[in-house]
Amino acid sequence: MSKKSTSAALPSSFEEAMAELEQLVARMEAGELPLEASVAAYKRGSELVKYCAAQLEKVDSQVKVLEGDMLKPFNADRAIEADE
């Protein structure tokens, strides 16, 4: 017997994942889902959050590679002074 995956396919992009996540949150906040559907939506939302976090981490790594030696430690005091 083969194991069925109840999860929907992963989105094709970060933006698609965020859009689906926003829709899930709106439906859950509106209270329009029955209990079983709410649990399924929560599970799907968790998968989407993990996907988005992985995509952001991947892009962050790429940016660090591209910037190489140009990376400098963040100085909060200087950032505040620059805003003033």
Curated annotation (Swiss-Prot):
Bidirectionally degrades single-stranded DNA into large acid-insoluble oligonucleotides, which are then degraded further into small acid-soluble oligonucleotides. One of its GO terms (biological process) is DNA catabolic process. Keywords: Cytoplasm, Exonuclease, Hydrolase, Nuclease. GO terms for molecular function: exodeoxyribonuclease VII activity. NCBIfam families: PRK00977.1-5 (NF002141), xseB (TIGR01280). Belongs to the XseB family. The keyword Oxidoreductase does not apply. It holds the Pfam family Exonuc_VII_S. This is Exodeoxyribonuclease 7 small subunit. InterPro entries: Exonuc_VII_S, Exonuc_VII_ssu_sf. It comes from the Bacteria. Its EC number is 3.1.11.6. GO terms for cellular component: cytosol; exodeoxyribonuclease VII complex. It is found in: Cytoplasm. The keyword Hydrolase applies.
